[in-house]
Amino acid sequence: MTDKRYPVNKTDKIRNKLKLFKWFALAFLFINILLMFYYDREPDLFNVNQVAKQRAEEHGHRVVTGFTTTATLLEVATTLLHKPGGYLTNDIMPPSVIMDNIPKWEYGVLVQIRDLARTLRNDFSRSQSQSLEDNDLKESEPKFNYDNNSWILPKTEAQYTEAIKALHHYLTRLSDDNEADAQFYARADNLVIYLKLVEKRLGGLSQKLSASVITDRLNTDLSGDTAATQSTYKPSELRVKTSWFQIDDNFYEARGSTWALIHFLRAIEVDFKAVLEKKNALVSLRQIIRELEATQESIWTPMILNGSGFGFFANHSLVMASYISRANAGIIDLRQLLENG
């Protein structure tokens, strides 16, 4: 007779529970892998003219000077929050928490959003240095500069959504003839200010990407000014090398930054067309955009390769740096043409 205090199926129950746990773990892993592939997709480029036209039709707006640039800024910011997987940088759950490529892409996009939002608030929307700033832009720009990695209280997405709402309100007023205090001034001096920001961003990205291989650099920080000084000592020659763990981070940051910049420059081509044509600089801007578009080509390897210069394997970072450097050289020439041409 079997003793009921020691059932014979106790081991089977434990085995069944372990088996169930194993299948649950495998299913969880499989679902997260699928989500990783889904989240890891970068948004496609969009047509800024179509976006502006569609937004104007949906909200009953008129496409006036500055409408395309502002609508493009809105679309890029909205895409940042609502692309596949949403905004990933501040996620604390898998698979997002173990992904770093798309969060770095998001950061690159965010930097460009912040730069254009700042220029829109301080320059594009103001006629003179003594003029009043727009209230909606005054509310929107600081919210875009909120911590990009805040999960709660308040979370990043909530702040950026508020920034988008304020920016949309500015756009509504901009296209309303009865709202004369909302303006966008497409002037050469305003565009020069923005291009100077772009120069620095692209120059910094190019330097970080070029450091994917060991580089000996001369310290040129004080060159061109015999009376210049700096806070602390730096050697006259520097050896620069990006950590292996940051190679793909820098690459995807640059890819996100150039993705956003392509759209912003396309929009500027529309709103500043008269200024650019007067300076005979429209073709120069289009060539810059074409150089940046090359940075968005498909990547055909499962990881970012980091070959050594002319070595056997490709070096994706150096290729990206080449495109960005050429675009930056074009930006510098365009800015000088607008200043002196």
Task: Identify the residue ranges that each predicted region occupies.
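N-terminal Lys/Arg-rich, disordered targeting/topogenic segments
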Residues: 1-16
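Extended amphipathic alpha-helical interaction segments
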Residues: 160-289
